[in-house]
């Protein structure tokens, strides 16, 4: 942390105002300092927020995902535990926090071995196969650069070698390892061990030399006990060979040290293994009541892990450079053992320890090259190399004031800062309380606004419902009026048609009566003419008789004529009487007809009224019947829909079941064909071997049989 150099003037001018913006920038992300369980920070991950990867009685692995594809894992192995072989998908840079153990890995097709101790830093390259055996309880912190996933699902930082091997089919493995099928069957059928197991080997007797390769293969991938046996069977690495070197932060001299603390940085110049890597390592130990001066890293992001004690961290948000009027310009939070905090590149920071405990943390920087942190205060302050007049103008102060400000601090990098952390914590608590108060006020304000909005919405909804109800009532009223008008119009039309029909019937009856009267008059005229003709005939006969009898019958003739005239008069009177009777009879019939018509009209009106009532009753019954039929139809449609869905679901299940059965049958047939092919190949190989053996060793003649 003490390796620094002076950057160009233009860079420092950008950060002069930044240092004095002291408020939190978490306002941008809507969060507050996270030592309170109810809050979180984008730059802080608490110990209990880690993601569990592996958890067994022999150890555990938890992880933290950092932005930009950085992945940190916390690996803990109990004494005499074994982390099973893994294939790295990315570079792995790690730091040993506590304990000891053995790291084994494959390097250029040869197996390498490295003793791990507290404080060791080392790197394994991408594509390396490794495993770890702990002696004492071992705690390792590792960082991986997993980047963006190119496959779905993501492979992660590493894969189990056992899973990779068993991903191939039996035929491929049998051909590759040249082992019998029963050996591979044992591998397939064995229970998968957890990633961390107990490394105690079980008691065993050495078998034949020809069985060693078989047992080794099985023990590598079958069970926990057999994996640990593999460790016992390995040949010991020649100690005279050159070992890979680690860098131990506790054995090397620190880069900076004074009474307030010390710091050390590990980069590619200190550790050859870091060459080509994207990570460096650093460690800081602050004594009680100390502080690392405000500074920033211009070339790398710093991902830190608290190893011991508690402390306060303040990070300034560079996005607030444009104006210090923003009341959220920096973020302060409290960290404790096991927490992870991140400081992005170019973000000024300061770490402080409390007066009652020291503060120790290590971390990874996202660059293996030598970093040059830039300090704003102390003997190494970048402000000292700037023109004092420019600095004075920048702060709007006099040169003497700036001179006193820059010369007051005699220390550099790590300073004594009594009660700084406590003051920062108190300020943070006040900020949190104030933020909580503002949030509660904001919540109350929003609640009131929502309540008012809800009331307005309810009032608006009631008005809309009332308007809708009135509109529906108006529509219903208009509909009823239209229906009544339509009924009245129909009734009027029916009455007009009925009146027209009755008028037509009346006219028809009058016409019939007139025709009957005319026929009667014609008949009477015809009778009168016939009577006249008959009288004329009789008269002519009488005249003939009278002519024949002349004188003697003259008197009788006159008498006869008188008598006939009398009779004619009587007949006429009789006919007039009959006509009068007929007229009276017709008048009586007409009166009776009118009475009957009036009665018929009243009966028809009564029948029409009853028919209208019956029609209305039928309409009501028809509407009720249609309503019942509609409800029954809807119920039937719902039941049909449910039955159809059930039928489709059963069809899909049947199709899926048939597909699975066919797939299982296909796989079974494929497996049988492969087994038959393997058997045929094995028989051919055995026959070839027998033939080769026969050609190599011809049959010996049999000894003569004893007699």
UniProtKB/Swiss-Prot annotation:
SMART domains, per the entry: Cupin_1
Highest taxon in the source lineage: Eukaryota
Entry-linked InterPro entries: Cupin_1, RmlC-like_jellyroll, RmlC_Cupin_sf, Seed_Storage-Functional
One Pfam short name: Cupin_1
Basic and acidic residues bias spans: 439-696
Main function: Seed storage protein.
UniProt similarity note: Belongs to the 7S seed storage protein family.
Name of the protein described by the UniProt record: Vicilin-like seed storage protein At2g18540
Organism: Arabidopsis thaliana
Lineage: Eukaryota, Viridiplantae, Streptophyta, Embryophyta, Tracheophyta
């Amino acid at each position: 942390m003490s390796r620094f150099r002076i950057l160009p003037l233009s860079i420092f001018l950008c950060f002069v105002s930044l240092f004095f913006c002291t408020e939190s920038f978490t306002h941008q992300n809507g969060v507050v300092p996270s030592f309170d369980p109810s809050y979180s920070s984008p730059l802080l991950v608490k110990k209990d927020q880690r993601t569990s990867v592996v958890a067994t009685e022999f150890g555990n692995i938890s992880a933290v995902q950092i932005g930009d594809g950085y992945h940190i894992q916390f690996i803990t192995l109990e004494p005499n535990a074994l982390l099973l072989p893994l294939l790295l998908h990315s570079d792995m840079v790690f730091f040993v926090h506590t304990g000891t153990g053995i790291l084994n890995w494959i390097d250029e097709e040869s197996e390498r071995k490295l003793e791990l101790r507290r404080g060791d830093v080392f790197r394994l390259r991408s594509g390396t196969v490794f495993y770890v055996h702990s002696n004492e309880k071992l705690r390792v912190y590792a960082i991986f650069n997993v980047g963006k996933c190119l496959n779905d699902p993501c492979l992660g930082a590493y894969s189990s070698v056992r899973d990779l091997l068993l991903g191939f089919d039996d035929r491929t493995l049998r051909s590759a390892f040249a082992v019998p099928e029963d050996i591979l069957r044992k591998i397939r059928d064995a229970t998968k061990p957890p990633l961390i197991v107990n490394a105690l080997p079980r008691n065993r007797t050495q078998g034949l030399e020809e069985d060693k390769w078989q047992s080794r293969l099985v023990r590598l991938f079958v069970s926990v006990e057999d994996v640990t046996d593999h460790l016992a069977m390995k040949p010991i690495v020649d100690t005279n060979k050159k070992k890979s070197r680690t860098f131990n932060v506790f054995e090397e001299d620190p880069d900076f040290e004074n009474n307030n603390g010390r710091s050390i940085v590990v980069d590619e110049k200190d550790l050859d293994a870091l060459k080509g890597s994207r990570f460096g390592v650093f460690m800081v130990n602050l004594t009680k009541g100390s502080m690392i001066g405000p500074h920033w890293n211009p070339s790398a992001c710093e991902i830190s892990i608290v190893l011991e004690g508690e402390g306060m961290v303040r990070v300034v948000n560079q996005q607030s450079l444009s104006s210090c009027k923003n009341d959220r310009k920096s973020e302060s939070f409290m960290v404790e053992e096991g927490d992870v905090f991140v400081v992005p590149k170019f973000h000024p920071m300061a770490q402080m320890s409390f007066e009652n405990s020291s503060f120790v943390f290590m971390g990874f920087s996202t660059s293996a090259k030598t970093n040059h942190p830039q300090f704003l205060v102390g003997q190494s302050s970048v402000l000292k190399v700037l023109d004092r007049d420019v600095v004075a103008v920048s702060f709007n102060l006099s040169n003497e004031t700036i001179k006193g400000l820059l010369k007051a601090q005699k220390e550099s990098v790590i300073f004594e800062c009594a009660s700084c952390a406590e003051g920062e914590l108190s300020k943070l608590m006040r900020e949190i309380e104030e933020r909580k108060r503002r949030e509660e006020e904001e919540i109350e304000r929003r609640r009131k606004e929502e309540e008012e909005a809800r009331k307005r919405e309810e009032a608006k909804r009631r008005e809309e419902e009332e308007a809708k109800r009135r509109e529906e009532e108006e529509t219903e009223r208009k509909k009823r009026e239209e229906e009544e008008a339509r009924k009245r119009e129909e009734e009027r039309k029916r009455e007009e048609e009925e009146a027209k029909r009755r008028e037509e019937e009346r006219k028809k009856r009058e016409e019939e009566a007139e025709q009957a009267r005319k026929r009667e008059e014609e008949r009477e005229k015809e009778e009168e003419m016939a009577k006249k003709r008959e009288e004329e005939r009789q008269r002519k006969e009488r005249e003939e008789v009278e002519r024949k009898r002349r004188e003697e019958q003259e008197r009788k003739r006159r008498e006869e004529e008188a008598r006939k005239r009398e009779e004619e008069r009587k007949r006429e009177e009789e006919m007039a009487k009959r006509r009068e009777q007929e007229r009276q009879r017709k008048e009586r019939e007409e009166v009776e007809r009118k009475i009957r018509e009036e009665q018929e009209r009243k009966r028809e009106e009564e029948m029409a009224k009853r028919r209208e009532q019956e029609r209305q009753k039928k309409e009501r019954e028809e509407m009720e019947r249609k309503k019942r039929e509609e409800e029954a139809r809807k119920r039937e449609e719902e039941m049909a829909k449910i039955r159809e869905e059930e039928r489709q679901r059963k069809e899909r299940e049947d199709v899926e079941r048939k597909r699975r059965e066919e797939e299982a049958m296909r796989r079974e047939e494929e497996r049988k064909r492969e087994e038959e092919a393997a058997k045929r190949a094995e028989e051919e190989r055995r026959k070839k071997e027998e033939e080769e053996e026969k050609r190599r060793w011809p049959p010996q003649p049999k000894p003569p049989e004893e007699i």
